[in-house]
Amino acid sequence: MKVNLILFSLFLLVSIMACNVFAFSISGGGSERSYKETEKTSAMTTTHSTKLQPSQAILFKMREDAPPLNLTEEMPPPFPTKANYLIHPVR
């Protein structure tokens, strides 16, 4: 009984580790190339470089042209606030 429990827990541990390794290899995580790309893009955003990719330039343009947010203005909620039905307690 004790040996079965040890073998089962060992099998469970190995299968969980195998699933993690498999998922990690599918996602392509941990590659040196992806690390260098993220390092480059983070450096671009922190130094406000003008060398933007076309997709980044479009996003930046949209952000720049967006109207300023007015957080002090009262806006009605998009849903009714008062219930028009009665909630009966469960008996």
UniProtKB/Swiss-Prot annotation:
Record lipid sites (N-palmitoyl cysteine): C19
Membrane topology: Lipid-anchor
Top-level taxon in the UniProt lineage: Bacteria
Compartments, record wording: Cell membrane
Protein keywords: Cell membrane, Lipoprotein, Membrane, Palmitate, Signal
GO cellular component annotations of the record: plasma membrane
Biological-process GO terms, alphabetical: colanic acid biosynthetic process
Lipidation (S-diacylglycerol cysteine): C19
Signal peptide positions (record): 1-18
The protein, known as: Uncharacterized lipoprotein YpdI
Natural source organism: Escherichia coli (strain K12)
Organism lineage string: Bacteria, Pseudomonadati, Pseudomonadota, Gammaproteobacteria, Enterobacterales
Gene: ypdI
